[in-house]
C-alpha cells in the first residue's frame, strides 16, 4: 500500500515504509522523479512553475479535525498536498470537499482511487474480493494482458506463469523497431492464433511484452515506441475470443489503454476491488465485442509477488 505522512509519500514494501523516490518507480525512463516530499515533487513536475513554499499542506492533524475552513480560503488555483493513512482520513476530507463544492468552490484532483471511494461514499462492495469469480462469464477461462515491465510486475509474472491453467505468450517488442506493416500484421495474427488455441483448450493465455527495457536516445522516441507497443496490444484486445470469461490488464498505462482504446469504453460499472489497489469494472450488456465482461485494472506498482496469481485464482474458482 501507500500512505502520505507529513507530506512525504511512502510505498510500503514488505512492511517497510519506503519513501517513493527510493523505489524502482522513481527511476522510470519516462516518468522519473527525485522527491518523496510532495511540495518538492510538485515543484519538480511543474519545472519550477509552482515553488514548494507555495504548496499548501494538509497534514494528518488537519485532516482529522476538518479542513473545511482552509478549503474555503483557497484562491487562485492553489496547489494542495494531502496526507492520508487510511480510508477514514479521506472520508473526512471528502465530506469537507463536498461541503465546499456546494458553496461554489471547484477542485481538480490528481489522486489514486481512495479519494473516489470517499467522494462517492461507497460502502462495502456487494461481492467480496474472494468471491468475484461470480462475475466471470459462464465460468470460461480469461486472458491476461501485461505491458508493465518493472521489477515488481516481472516478479508477479513469474509467479503467475507457475499457476495451473496458465500459458504464457511472450511478445518480443524489439520486432516493432523496424518491422514493416505486413510483418506487424503477421506477428499480430500469430499471437491471436496462439491465444485461440490456448483458450479452446480451456486454459488462460498470458500475453506479456519482453522484459528487457529498450534504450532510446530521447524521451520522445521512447514514447513513440511505447505507442507502437500499446497499439499492438490493443489490436490483440480487440481480436480476443468473444467468449472469454474475464480480462486482467497489468500496468497503469496498459489498463488505461485497454479501457479507452482496446474496449472503447465511455462508461463502465465499477464492481469493487479484487485485490487492494486493483479495481474491477464490467462492460455494458450491449458492448459490441464483450458484453458484461469483468475487467481487472492492475497497476504496475501494486501487490506483492503473488498478487497477479491471486487475482487470476480468484476469478478462476469454479462456481457451484
Which sequence ranges carry the predicted segments?
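General beta-strand structural signal in soluble alpha/beta enzymes
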Residues: 50-56, 80-84, 107-112, 117, ...
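Residue-level preference for the first positions of well-ordered beta-strands
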Residues: 77-81, 106-108, 141-143, 202-206, ...
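Acidic, glycine-rich loop-and-beta core segments that form the ion-binding/anion-interacting portion
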Residues: 100-171
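Solvent-exposed alpha-helices and their adjacent loops that cap or buttress functional pockets
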Residues: 71-75, 98-103, 133-138, 197-200, ...
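Active-site histidine-anchored catalytic micro-motif
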Residues: 1-36, 244-252, 256-305, 310
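Cap/lid and interdomain-hinge subdomains that line or gate substrate/regulatory clefts
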Residues: 1-90, 318-320
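Short acidic, glycine/serine/threonine-rich loops at helix termini
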Residues: 3-13, 92-96, 120-124, 156-157, ...
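C-terminal structural cap/anchor segments
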Residues: 188-252
